[in-house]
Swiss-Prot record:
It is an enzyme of class 2 (transferase). The gene is trmB. It comes from the Bacteria. Substrate binds at K129, D161. Its EC number is 2.1.1.33. Pfam families: Methyltransf_4 (PF02390). Belongs to the class I-like SAM-binding methyltransferase superfamily. TrmB family. One of its GO terms (cellular component) is tRNA methyltransferase complex. This is tRNA (guanine-N(7)-)-methyltransferase. It comes from Wolbachia pipientis wMel. Pathway: tRNA modification; N(7)-methylguanine-tRNA biosynthesis. It catalyses: guanosine(46) in tRNA + S-adenosyl-L-methionine = N(7)-methylguanosine(46) in tRNA + S-adenosyl-L-homocysteine. Coiled coil: none annotated.
Length: 221
């Protein structure tokens, strides 16, 4: 089903449910979507990174193990991937992860402005049919929302192996007055399931590093 109660056009659908024991574990890592609870979390953390659509959680695990001082919030509606990540963080006793399994845009809207150091959007659904393009996660409205939430020194990392979507992403970033981007490989990153699939199928992967437009120092690094 698509999340029809959201003000956003649905960009995903859910096809499964968690087993009761896994659902119980998820409660320990779930973030509450209210401005008050999110502001409390933000005020208690030095650094916050957010991944929108974390899949099986490969990138999240890699990042939190290498950056133990940050809080990583992952958003993923597909519960099979959520279950796999929960298993891994329980085995490895990881404490600096929180999860959200509904529409990421509803959660991000409640973040204080200038509070997130980094956003990851890795291989979002390209919705390749022209009639479905309106369902694409990345558009000017959503990018403007992210621009409000990232720190002045923050970055948005986007990856896609769908060339039409890449051109769409570039076009929509250019429509955001507060954002600028360059195409460049990520230096701190691990291959995800969809990246490995792209390499196997010999599809070019395009990486976007997006910064607030007056953060020239970051863009020059």
């Amino acid at each position: 089903m698509l999340f029809k109660n959201s003000k956003w056009i649905g960009s995903f659908s859910r096809r499964s449910r968690l087993k009761p024991d896994v659902d119980e574990i998820l409660e320990k890592y779930s973030i509450q979507n209210s401005k008050e609870s999110i502001e409390k979390i933000v005020n208690s953390q030095k650094r916050i990174w957010v991944e929108i659509g974390f899949g099986n959680g490969e990138n999240m695990l890699y990042q939190v193990l290498n950056e133990p001082d940050l809080l990583f919030i992952g958003c993923e509606p597909y519960l099979k991937g959520v279950s796999r990540l929960l298993t891994n963080i329980e085995i490895q006793n990881i404490k600096n992860i929180l999860m959200w399994t509904e529409d990421a845009r509803e959660l991000i809207a409640n973040f204080p402005d200038n509070s997130v150091e980094r956003f990851f959007i890795l291989f979002p659904d390209p919705w390749p049919k022209r009639s479905h393009n309106k369902r694409r996660l990345i558009n000017t409205e959503f990018l403007n929302l992210l621009a409000k939430k990232i720190l002045i020194t923050g970055e948005i990392f986007i990856a896609t192996d769908h060339q039409d979507y890449a051109e769409w992403i570039a076009s929509h970033i250019k429509q955001c007055n507060s954002l600028i981007y360059r195409e460049d490989d990520f230096t701190s990153y691990t291959l995800t399931k969809y990246h490995r699939r792209a390499l196997k199928d010999q599809r070019k992967v395009r990486f976007f590093k997006v910064s607030v437009i007056n953060n020239l120092q970051t863009m020059d690094q």
